[in-house]
Amino acid sequence: MFTKSVFIALVAGVLGVTAAYDPAHMPAKTDAKGGQTGYNDCQQRYGATNPKAKCQNIFINSVKDFCLWGPPKTNGADTVGDLEAVMVSYCMKSGYGTRLIPDGTIHGAHFLKTPSFVQITGTGDFTKIHIQAGDEGGELDPHGATGSGNPVGGQVFTRAYTGNWEQLPEWQNFMSATEYCFRACRSGPWDRQWCPHIYDVMGCLWNEPANYDRGVFEQCDGTEGEWPGVYSGSTWYQGVKPTPAAQPAGKSSNCRYYPSISNGPAIKTPSKRSVMATHVKRSPEWEEEP
C-alpha cells in the first residue's frame, strides 16, 4: 500500500499536480492563466471579512465554522450554472477575508468528519447570498468542463483533523436556493472516488447521502459509507437507465448538538506561523468552540 507521501509524489509526477497550497501564504491568484476572476490572498487583500470580497478559498472546520460557494452578485436572472466559474466564498466566521453567510441563512447544518472527507449538509435561504429563488442549483468542483475548476482558482482547506491547516484537493459543493452539501476529500488513492465529479445533475441527496433536517445543528464523527455511483464493483454513469438509488449514508457517532449557529470571529485563521498538516494532539473541535 502506498503511503500518503509516496502517492502524492507519484500523482505529481504523472499528472503534473502542483504542491499543496498553504492558506497563510497564498498567491494573488492560483489559476490566473485559467481566467480566475477572484483572489486567493484574501486576508491580505480584504482583511477579516468584506462584503465585496472576491475570495476563492473555502474553509470547512466544524458545524459552526464552514464556508459555501455563492454568486458574487445577482442580476435577477443568472443561475448557479451560469455563474459557477466566478463563484466566491461565503463563510459563517470572519477572519478568512471572505464574505459572511448572513445570520439566519442556514436553517440546518450537519457536519460529518470521516477518515477520508469532511462534509457539511443542510438547508437554508440562499437568496441571501445571491442565488435566485427557485434555482435548482448545480455542482461546483475543482475540475469543471475546462479543467480549471468551478470556480476557477477555488481552493479548500480544513483544520478538522490535526488542528493545523490541510488542503483538500478533491471536493464537490452542490448549491441550490434552498439546499446545500459540501464534501471535501483528503489527499489519497481514493479521493476521486469519495469526491466524484461525474454526477452533476444528481444533486445533494444522491451524491452526499446524509442528514438534511431543518432546525438541527449537529457535529459528528462517522464512516464514509460507499463510493457514490459504484455498485458491486461496477460504475454507473449519469444518464444510463435505470437510475440507481443513492448509496446508504455511513454511520455517525460522537454527535454533538447545538441550538443554532451564528457569525463571529473564527477561533483559528491561517497565519504565517502555521505549519501545514502537522499532526498535533488536540481536543475535539466542539470543545474548542465558544
UniProtKB/Swiss-Prot annotation:
Knockout consequences: Results in a thickened cell wall with altered chitin composition and leads to secretory defects. Decreases virulence on maize; double knockout of ROW1 exacerbates the effect.
Disordered: annotated segments: 266-290
Signal peptide boundaries: 1-19
Transmembrane segments: none
Keyword Transmembrane helix: no
Biological processes per GO annotation: appressorium formation
Entry's localization field: Secreted; Nucleus
Primary subcellular site in the record, as a coarse category: secreted
Keywords: Nucleus, Secreted, Signal, Virulence
GO cellular component labels: extracellular region; nucleus
Function per UniProt: Plays a role in the formation of the appressorium, a specialized infection structure with the purpose of penetrating the host surface, and is required for proper remodeling of the appressorium wall and vesicle secretion.
Protein's UniProt name: Appressorium protein ROW2
Lineage: Eukaryota, Fungi, Dikarya, Basidiomycota, Ustilaginomycotina
